[in-house]
Amino acid sequence: MKSGGNTNTKLILVHPYIQKQTSTNRLWLLAFVSFFTIAFLLTLLYTTDSIISSKNNSATVSSAVNSAVTTATISQLPTTAINAMLHYASRSNDSYHMSYGEMKSISDVLRRCSPPCNLLVFGLTHETLLWKSLNHNGRTVFIEENRYYAAYFEEIHPEIEVFDVQYTTKAREARELVSAVKEAARNECRPVQNLLFSDCKLGLNDLPNHVYDVDWDVILVDGPRGDGGDVPGRMSSIFTAAVLARSKKGGNPKTHVFVHDYYRDVERLCGDEFLCRENLVESNDLLAHYVLEKMDKNSTQFCRGRKKKRSVSSPSA
């Protein structure tokens, strides 16, 4: 029997496993991406930590190297080298050179001075290069009366810092000048002041400005000339040293002041009046060694002993 029409039967097959497979693939893809994301982040963090650690290590090494270099820079000269320098300097044929004992007194103070040590020297002498060498870790400045010699010396020794100054005094006028300064001790010649603006007859006010700003640890007075009545004498250099020492604003409150040729009348007179006997700690051959402390800005007396004497004698007057 034949059927009367075409009947097409269509079958729709549903494969549920395909949908499940797609979901599973997405999960695997998500897991894969997440894994690599976490791995990337961990790698980035590790790299950053490594860079920071490397920088810190480099900084530590650099700091250690700098510290070692600094320590080496401020190291002192060997004792044997210093003794050799003093020995040969004292053996000079120059009749105006210092003795071994005098140079050693100054050398010992420079060795104990904490670097950087500030050394001020009045006068270019036979020992100039010695002082510069002994204070190789600090600053050394020289003050010279002869401008031509100062320029010549600086030309052949460019490492030397020297300034010329014009002295207006005469050694034969020492007592009159000292008396005038004592009378003006409460005004223009007071012991604590900025000499750059001073009108005191014995104050040096024409040095470079920065010289007055330095806190000098050691001052050596070995100039200007003082071996005659018409030479400048050392009244101004001793007075200036006394004021600089007492007017310090920082650093070590004590200043070592050395005066050479202390046997002469002018050096002894000015030493007693401005540096004071109570501050004299040593006298070696022709060299006097004082230790001065900075004073209050309102001070009007260079020496404490004189103030006491006046207070004792006033009741009996």
UniProtKB/Swiss-Prot annotation:
It comes from the Eukaryota. PANTHER family: OS11G0490100 PROTEIN (PTHR31444). Keywords: Golgi apparatus, Membrane, Transmembrane, Transmembrane helix. It is a single-pass membrane protein. Required for xylan biosynthesis, but not directly involved in catalyzing the addition of sugars to the growing polymer. InterPro entries: IRX15/GXM/AGM. The lineage of its organism: Eukaryota, Viridiplantae, Streptophyta, Embryophyta, Tracheophyta. The keyword Membrane applies. GO terms for biological process: plant-type secondary cell wall biogenesis; xylan biosynthetic process. Its main location: Golgi. It is found in: Golgi apparatus membrane. NCBIfam families: A_thal_3515. Pfam families: IRX15_IRX15L_GXM. GO terms for cellular component: Golgi apparatus; Golgi membrane. Coiled coil: none annotated. Expressed in roots, rosette leaves, stems and siliques. Expressed in the xylem. The gene is IRX15-L. Disruption phenotype: No visible phenotype; due to redundancy with IRX15-L. Irx15 and irx15-l double mutants have a mild collapsed xylem phenotype, irregular secondary cell wall margins in fiber cells, uneven distribution of xylan in the cell wall and a lower degree of xylan polymerization, but no visible growth phenotype. It comes from Arabidopsis thaliana (Mouse-ear cress). This is Protein IRX15-LIKE.
